[in-house]
């Protein structure tokens, strides 16, 4: 959810110079630029320049859809398509399920294939994954920037995360 409705690359004056190309916007990008009520991503900043640290799946997320940009969900569907084509059955376990249920959600599985960008994690997620690996589970890491930033799920509101980027690393804003 960290990238949900991200628009920072459209609000950055120097992005085209950094990327050496013109910005291309999909209709959903144009819509998000004019409809702030759908919220920002944790890569965006508020109008006062402070970073957005909270995101939620409990809102329309317009950049998380099939046939969108080859990023996140769309890239992950390449993995599921490959598994289907190869005749392998699979289940999808979300980060939120791993956070809430820990190692128990992975019990019974021999192999875990990560998504293409497993960047954000909680202590509970890492503990569950580590316990499962210690029990003999095997993991295929198919991503980049994996296990990079720490997040916290809201205790009373499922689907809400907070991300404070205080450690060293590449980021669009620095947490206080």
Labelled PLM ranges:
Residues 20, 141-142, 167-171:
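Short, surface-exposed, polar/charged, turn-prone segments marking secondary-structure boundaries
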Residues 149-176:
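Extended catalytic-interface subdomain
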Residues 68-155:
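Helical hinge/lid and interdomain linker segments adjacent to catalytic or ligand-binding clefts
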Residues 1-106:
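Aromatic-Pro/Gly-enriched surface loop or interdomain linker
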Residues 9, 20, 112, 131-133, ...:
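Short, low-complexity, polar/charged sequence segments that are solvent-exposed and flexible
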């Amino acid at each position: 959810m960290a990238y949900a409705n991200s628009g920072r690359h459209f609000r950055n004056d120097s992005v085209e110079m950094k990327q050496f190309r013109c910005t291309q916007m999909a209709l959903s990008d144009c819509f998000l630029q004019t409809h702030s009520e759908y919220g920002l991503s944790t890569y965006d900043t508020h109008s006062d320049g402070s970073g957005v640290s909270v995101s939620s799946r409990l809102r329309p997320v317009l950049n998380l859809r099939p046939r969108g940009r080859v990023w996140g969900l769309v890239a992950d569907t390449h993995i599921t398509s490959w598994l289907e084509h190869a005749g392998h059955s699979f289940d999808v376990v979300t980060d939120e399920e791993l956070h809430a249920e820990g190692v128990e959600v992975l019990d019974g599985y021999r192999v875990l294939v990560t998504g293409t960008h497993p960047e954000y994690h909680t202590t509970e997620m890492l503990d569950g994954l580590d316990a499962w690996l210690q029990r003999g589970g095997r993991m295929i890491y198919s991503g980049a920037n994996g296990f990079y930033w720490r997040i916290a799920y809201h205790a009373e509101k499922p689907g809400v995360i907070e991300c404070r980027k205080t450690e060293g690393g590449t980021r669009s804003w620095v947490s206080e």
